[in-house]
Swiss-Prot record:
Its EC number is 2.1.3.2. Belongs to the aspartate/ornithine carbamoyltransferase superfamily. ATCase family. This is Aspartate carbamoyltransferase catalytic subunit. One of its GO terms (cellular component) is cytosol. Heterododecamer (2C3:3R2) of six catalytic PyrB chains organized as two trimers (C3), and six regulatory PyrI chains organized as three dimers (R2). Disulfide bonds: none annotated. It comes from the Bacteria. It is an enzyme of class 2 (transferase). It comes from Streptococcus equi subsp. equi (strain 4047). Gene3D superfamilies: Aspartate/ornithine carbamoyltransferase.
Length: 311
């Protein structure tokens, strides 16, 4: 991996832990340049990408697809439900096949944590792997679009007070963001149901009730309650969760004028956030979605740079 004059070159992108601060800032800067229309698009029509999604997705899947098309790549159609996966084909063999066909970039979402390790360790698979989310592990492209959204607002990360709130244990978004935000100098707070908190967060910030900190926050990053990863013993009613942990109208009024609200979506309205606040003046949820395309363009460009440089 390398970066020279904001030109980032990556072999794979699977975890925020693998990126230097310089690479992170380079990708954010490049995403901003794409957003501003300052980048001349090269002829990438000889390059092939495949989006292999084994979990449901709207924003990540479609924004990668838009990004790939904006950059002029050829995007292979893949539907797990109609592929050989239904005949028992493993993830490894699916990616091995795509690689053998000449696919250079595989964007993958999979329910297994660290699914990518066997792929990037393979001496046979030559495709570059971009992690579109692994189980409860990492979500690097979401993290990078979150960083771009924050940077557009404040112009820096150092000293910002940021709360990450909600279903922490199951959130790959929380884990990716906490790692890099701490490295960039932000002051982190976590809150949500205690049974959805684990000691792995202790090294990155403080667990604190939202009502004790909300009026000091610069960024409130809400997380989706991942019902599909819970058993019944951990459940709350929608009303109880919203009252105890969600962004209510009363809590919204306590935020600083300069504070922003974020959410990776999909949003459970009137659970994590009151329905009418999703598009409120302080909300940047739609901006996050839009920024996803430009950051993912920067990621794909960095992968193509890395393949050209053979990093």
């Amino acid at each position: 991996m390398s970066v020279v004059n904001n030109r980032v070159a990556l072999k794979h992108l699977v975890s925020m832990e693998h990126l230097t601060n310089e690479e992170v800032l380079g990708l954010i800067s490049r995403g901003s340049e794409y957003k501003a229309g300052k980048v001349a698009i090269k002829d990438n029509s000889r390059h092939f990408a495949a989006n292999l999604f084994f979990e449901n997705s709207t924003r990540t899947h479609k924004s990668f697809e838009v990004a790939e098309n904006k950059l002029g790549l050829r995007v292979l159609d893949f539907n797990a439900d109609t592929s050989a996966v239904n005949k028992g084909e493993t993830l490894y063999d699916t990616v091995l096949t795509m690689s053998a066909l000449g696919t250079e970039i595989c964007v993958i979402r999979h329910p297994e944590d660290d699914y990518y390790q066997q792929l990037i360790d393979s001496p046979t698979i030559t495709a570059s792997i971009v992690n579109g989310g692994d189980g409860s592990g990492q979500h690097p492209s979401q993290c990078l679009l979150d960083l771009l959204t924050i940077y557009e607002e404040f112009g820096h990360f150092d000293g910002l007070k940021i709360a990450i709130a909600g279903d922490l244990t199951h959130s790959r978004v929380a884990k990716s963001n906490m790692q890099i935000l701490k490295r960039l100098g932000a002051e982190l707070y976590f809150y949500g149901p205690e049974q959805w908190y684990s000691s792995e967060f202790d090294s990155y910030g403080r667990y604190m009730a939202i009502d004790h900190i909300i009026d000091q926050l610069d960024v409130l990053m809400l997380l989706r309650v991942q019902h599909e990863r819970h058993d019944g013993s951990q459940s709350f009613s929608k009303e109880d969760y919203h009252r105890q942990f969600g962004l209510t109208e009363e809590r919204y009024r306590r935020l600083k004028d300069s504070a922003i609200i974020m959410h990776p979506a999909p949003v459970n309205r009137d659970v994590e956030i009151a329905d009418h606040l999703v598009e409120a003046p302080k909300a940047r949820i739609v901006a996050q979605m839009a920024n996803g395309v430009f950051v993912r363009m920067a990621i794909i460009e960095a992968i193509l740079n890395g393949r050209n440089d053979k990093v």
